[in-house]
A protein has these predicted regions:
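"…together with the soluble PPM/PP2C metallo-phosphatase catalytic core" -> "…together
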Residues: 1-232
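Cytosolic, membrane-interface loops and tails of multi-pass inner-membrane proteins
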Residues: 16-42, 235-266, 328
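Membrane-interface capping segments at transmembrane-helix boundaries
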Residues: 20-25, 185-186, 239, 308-324
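Membrane-interface starts of transmembrane alpha-helices
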Residues: 87-91, 193, 263-271, 292-293
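Small-residue-rich transmembrane alpha-helices that serve as helix-helix interface/gating elements
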Residues: 224, 293-309
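Alpha-helical transmembrane segments of integral membrane proteins
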Residues: 251, 259-282, 287
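Extracellular/periplasmic helix-loop-helix junctions in multi-pass membrane proteins
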Residues: 281-299
Length: 329
């Protein structure tokens, strides 16, 4: 317990030091018509997840060196991208290289199954970017990461799929970030930046990868279902609208809630957090522990969330169209 208190204090100090550096170096996020915020805020506060991974490794003996190398690479490139925009090709190369390092740590780079490895790499990188796309309002990255990490910690208490200390240390990093980001619109001290949203995505996917490999059950991805539905269906929607997927937008369901419906950032983030917690805890404690039941639970939750997304968009998307039309006047 004392160790974790020390880690929390160190991370809190590190975040405050970063704020001084960001202020001095003008690492800021300026709002535009596609943003869900209206004031200039420090960017890159999510670097605390990378710092947390290093602090954890220092305290617990570097048990996952290849994971740490991948985390450092992907977060480092993302941080540079937060400061000055990098080409998409550079970001993707870093993401795939980092995923390979994570897979090496997971001991799944068996090239006799090369086609499965390639598919898994694409899913890993795709999921990383979807989690990144979902970072658009105060508190959503911090809150949702806790909604994923806490159930993971509960599962890991009994089965020991992965180092519990890594999960707890990442929870502490998320709590530190919550202190400065889980606030109403206009009140956040910092935003995560790509370094934060991509960094925490890398950690969560690595943790889930350990569980999936050791249980041989891919349905544990249900721990990311709420983000997955909003992220994937929004991509499908944008493809139907023939939009450039690389351009910024405000079409996610959570963005419609925060912008067009004027629901507070903290309320929207809390809703996403609560939905994921309910689904994950139900999966752990209510769903019978066999693969068939896991799949039925996953498919059922997926259908319910997807229907809710479609009905919500049908009812309220016209408000976003009106907003876009107003920009052209």
């Amino acid at each position: 317990m004392v160790t974790y208190i020390v880690i929390f204090v160190l991370l809190l100090i590190a975040e405050l030091v970063y704020f001084r550096i960001a202020n001095k170096c003008n690492i800021i996020d300026k709002p535009n018509e596609r943003s869900s915020h209206t004031s200039i805020v420090l960017r890159g506060g999510g670097i605390i997840f990378l710092i947390g991974a290093w602090v954890w490794s220092g305290f617990f003996g570097f048990p996952y060196p290849w994971f740490l190398a991948g985390m450092t690479l992907i977060a480092g490139v993302s941080f540079v991208d937060d400061i000055r925009s990098l080409p998409d090709s550079v970001r993707l190369e870093a993401q795939f290289a980092s995923a390979v390092l994570a897979f090496y740590q997971l001991d799944i780079l068996h090239w006799s199954m090369w086609w499965m490895i390639i598919f898994a790499l694409i899913v890993y990188v795709g999921a990383t970017n979807i989690i990144n796309f979902m970072d658009g309002i105060n508190g959503i990255t911090a809150g949702y990461s806790l909604a994923v990490l806490v159930p993971l910690a509960l599962v890991n208490m009994n089965e020991d799929f992965v180092e519990q200390s890594l999960i707890i240390s990442t929870i502490l990093a998320s709590l530190v970030f919550c202190v400065f980001n889980f606030r109403p619109k206009g009140k956040a001290k910092c935003f995560a930046g790509d370094v934060g949203s991509i960094g925490i995505a890398f950690i969560m996917l690595f943790l889930l990868g350990n569980v999936i490999i050791k249980t041989q059950d891919v349905t544990w991805l249900i721990f990311l279902l709420v983000y997955g539905v909003d992220g994937c269906l929004t991509i499908v929607h944008r493809i139907m609208l023939h939009e450039n997927l690389g351009e910024a937008h405000r079409k996610h369901a959570y963005q419609l809630m925060a912008n067009e419906l004027k629901i507070g950032h903290v309320k929207v983030s809390s809703l996403y957090m609560a939905m994921q917690l309910i689904i994950s805890l139900g999966f752990i404690y209510l769903c019978p522990d066999n693969v068939a039941c896991h799949w039925m639970y996953l498919v059922g939750a997926l259908v319910v969330l997807s229907l809710a997304y479609v009905l919500f968009k049908k009812k309220y998307y016209h408000l976003h169209e009106e907003y876009l039309a107003s920009l052209k006047k």
